[in-house]
Amino acid sequence: MNDYNHYFHFPREEWRKLEVSKDQILTAEELEEIRGLNDRISLQDISEIYLPLIKLIAIQYHEAIFIHGEKMEYLKKKESRAPFIIALAGSVAVGKSTTARVFKLMLDRWFSKTRQVELVTTDGFLFPNKVLEERGIMNKKGFPESYDRDRFAKFLTDLKTNKEAVEVPLYSHFTYDVLDETRMMHNPDIVIIEGINVLQADQHESLFPSDFFDFSVYMDAAEADIKKWYLERFFMLRETAFQDKSSYFHQYTKINKKEAETFALGVWDTINGVNLKENIEKTKYRADLVLHKGTDHLISDIYLRK
């Protein structure tokens, strides 16, 4: 399937008219703190796009809690509901990380911090660089085979079986590698899982990650636009984070701009662009909701599964 026949289509102007009882729940300063590099999200986007979306997620959350309560009462069981899991997928450089941080902060505010909301990135479930190098797939980092799917499946199972403490692996974009340390999550109510691979399915597995999700979102844009944003972000990082001598990518600050551009284009054409076409984009129609961005990096259309 490669169309939106099973989705309601909301152009931005229609979506923004959806009634939301709560006022703006983020300040300009807070948005600036969580905004990703080269992301053009504004308070207007928060009001017109994200506030109605957070209300929709809250409706889904309350519905899940109600159904669970009714089921437990009927079955005469006393088991608390597992965390409500929101999956957020999409290409590199499309704005997933910023959107995930916006989701977390806005859900915290929506529920007046009466619900524990956690954010997890699937980067932590990549195999360490050492393993990728041993297997000869360092140039496939981000592809399905570069992830520890067993570890990710255990993580999701632990969440959905109400394990009291769930281990979360950590990743550093600075060192470009999985960290040795982890963090623990304790009884979250809502978990946002962000990553390029969250909606991918391995046909050899008995369970798909999507089996564990309560709501899923795909960040979409034309490939030409994503490629442009990727290059813009690369050069912004080259002038900032890459300047640190400890950065994995520091070496690319020592070459001239043309050489750096050739390198970045090569990464896109042989890795990120290929992964988008072969693996990531195919998962779009598995999502409950698709947020489509225009050339200006702003969300222009929303597609909600019927």
Swiss-Prot record:
EC number: 2.7.1.33
Keywords assigned by UniProt, alphabetized: ATP-binding, Coenzyme A biosynthesis, Cytoplasm, Kinase, Nucleotide-binding, Transferase
Subcellular location, principal: cytoplasm
CDD domains listed in its UniProt record: PanK
Residues annotated to bind ATP: 90-97
Catalytic reaction(s) noted: (R)-pantothenate + ATP = (R)-4'-phosphopantothenate + ADP + H(+)
GO molecular function (one): ATP binding
Keyword S-adenosyl-L-methionine belongs to the record: no
Top-tier EC class: transferase
GO biological process, one term: coenzyme A biosynthetic process
Domain of life of the source: Bacteria
Pfam families named among the record's database cross-references: PRK
Family designation: Belongs to the prokaryotic pantothenate kinase family.
Name under which the protein is recorded: Pantothenate kinase
Organism encoding this protein: Listeria welshimeri serovar 6b (strain ATCC 35897 / DSM 20650 / CCUG 15529 / CIP 8149 / NCTC 11857 / SLCC 5334 / V8)
Protein encoded by which gene: coaA
